[in-house]
Amino acid sequence: MILGVIYDLLRWEEKNLIQEARKLGHTVIPIYTKDFYYFYNNDSNETLGDLDVVIQRNTSHARAVITSTIFENLSYKTINDSSTLIKCENKLYTLSLLSKHGIRVPKTIVAFSKEKALELANKLSYPVVIKPVEGSWGRMVARAIDEDTLRNFLEYQEYTTLQFRYIYLIQEFVKKPDRDIRIFTIGDEAPVGIYRVNSRNWKTNTALGAKAEPLKIDEELQDLALKVKDIIGGFFLGIDVFEDPERGYIINEVNGVPEYKNTVRVNNFNVSEYLIRKIEEWIKK
């Protein structure tokens, strides 16, 4: 099998993915995005050869979507495809799809003026969480304890360069324990995950200091993860889940280019090898 791995930053995951693929006897062609280009309707494009699959590993959402689109235009199988990446990156798109199919998500308000956002936030009761429509690693996600705090956050958002700065996404503050769950779907399975524990901060992103711990996946969580995968699409997803003491599992977000270094470390589970073997099965079908 010939694999292309496209990346803009060579992190542990990309290095491990290339290493494990080569260990399994596959040919890997690393593609550095900043050196990559494409001319539409032009014969001067450099050929990438007979790639069986391109694995998308760009950290930049824009680069990921556009390069996946190019590879799809060239008829390469791409993990993940551009449609999946768009659904994952846009939180309102994700929430809309999941709620439409009966998946429990945080109570969410979307408003198009600051005044309406402030008015509707009272229906959720404080504290509330404000987050950008697009973004990752917990950046620009804030908790407002009252209306005055929320107003300040909304005004700050308006003066940023965010693409959706005049769209206000406000959610309930889910009273989860000092942790959340990241569970991975690979192909048609949900084989591994972690708890992300942070007793010092309400944000549970490992990028913000949360500690990874092994996750024992129960049947309900596994079924839920696979339902989300079927709705969103994609071959390799990282799904973030809250545990509400009364309502049970709540899907928070879905990541289309998930990091997994900490998952490998605490579970002693080779995510890269598992992913490659599932790709092998997929290609043979």
From Swiss-Prot:
The gene is lysX. Its EC number is 6.3.2.43. The keyword RNA-binding does not apply. GO terms for biological process: lysine biosynthetic process via aminoadipic acid; protein modification process. Mg(2+) 1 binds at residues 240, 253. This is Alpha-aminoadipate--LysW ligase LysX. GO terms for cellular component: cytoplasm. Keywords: Amino-acid biosynthesis, ATP-binding, Ligase, Lysine biosynthesis, Magnesium, Metal-binding, Nucleotide-binding. Pathway: Amino-acid biosynthesis; L-lysine biosynthesis via AAA pathway; L-lysine from L-alpha-aminoadipate (Thermus route): step 1/5.
